[in-house]
Each structure stands twice: as structure tokens, then as C-alpha cells.
């Protein structure tokens, strides 16, 4: 599988002040995740990763989260929580060895909840 372009970022359509990381394949969005980074607190959050069913299990989500971590360097990665029961294994797998481990963490005072 080869993506049309490298990872793309745009303002999140769901959360004010957040960004959305997207991967496109053949003109179709196949992966997206909302994220927010606070450079002051060195904290980051990701929310609502989504991979179209046809490509689930192909490593797109893992690759997208890795690209974000590589881009933002030394920050601790979290989520706001509320994961679906079926997603727990995913978060454990992608959080292994990651500062913060994508564990639940409230937003810092510098970040608008959107």
C-alpha cells in the first residue's frame, strides 16, 4: 500500500484549536486522528483515531501516531479517555514504550477542550 501523499494536517473539523492528521489512498481518506500538543507542558493528546474498515490491521494508525511522535519530539502522549472496550488492546499496543503511553490525562490549562 502506498499513500497518495505524506501525512496531511488540517484543522480538526470536530475540535476547535485541534489538528487532524490524515492519510489518503487513491483520493480516499483511509486514516485520521485528532491531536493537540501543548509545548509549555510538553503534553500531547490524540483522540478518535479512525481507519476505514478495509485497511484496519494494516498498521496505518500505528504509523500515523509514530509520525506525530517523531514530529513533536519529547512530549508525553495521552488521550482524554473513554475508549471503547474493543479499542483497549489497540491503545495498549500503540502505547508500549511511548512516554505517557496514551493513558488518560486531563487537558492542561493551556489547551481549549474544543
Regions picked out by a protein language model, each given a short descriptive name:
Residues 1-9:
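Conserved N-terminal entry element of GNAT/NAT acetyltransferase domains
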Residues 11-32:
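Conserved beta-hairpin
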Residues 28-37, 43-45:
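Conserved beta-strand in the GNAT
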Residues 42-53:
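Conserved acetyl-CoA binding element of GNAT-fold acetyltransferases
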Residues 51, 57-70:
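Conserved acetyl-CoA-binding loop-helix of GNAT-fold acetyltransferases
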Residues 70-83:
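Conserved GNAT acetyl-CoA-binding A-motif
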Residues 80, 97-114:
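Conserved catalytic-core motifs of GNAT/GCN5-like acyltransferases
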Residues 91:
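Conserved active-site tyrosine of GNAT-family acetyltransferases
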Amino acid at each position: 500500500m502506498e499513500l497518495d501523499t505524506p501525512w496531511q494536517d488540517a484543522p480538526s473539523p470536530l475540535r476547535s484549536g485541534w489538528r487532524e492528521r490524515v492519510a489518503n489512498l487513491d483520493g480516499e481518506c483511509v486514516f485520521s486522528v485528532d491531536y493537540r500538543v501543548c509545548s509549555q507542558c510538553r503534553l500531547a493528546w490524540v483522540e478518535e483515531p479512525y481507519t476505514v474498515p478495509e485497511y484496519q490491521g494494516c498498521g496505518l494508525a500505528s504509523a500515523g501516531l509514530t509520525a506525530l511522535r517523531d514530529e513533536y519530539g519529547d512530549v508525553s502522549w495521552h488521550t482524554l479517555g473513554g475508549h471503547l472496550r474493543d479499542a483497549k488492546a489497540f491503545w495498549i499496543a500503540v502505547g508500549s514504550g511511548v512516554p505517557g503511553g496514551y493513558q488518560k490525562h486531563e487537558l492542561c490549562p493551556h489547551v481549549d477542550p474544543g
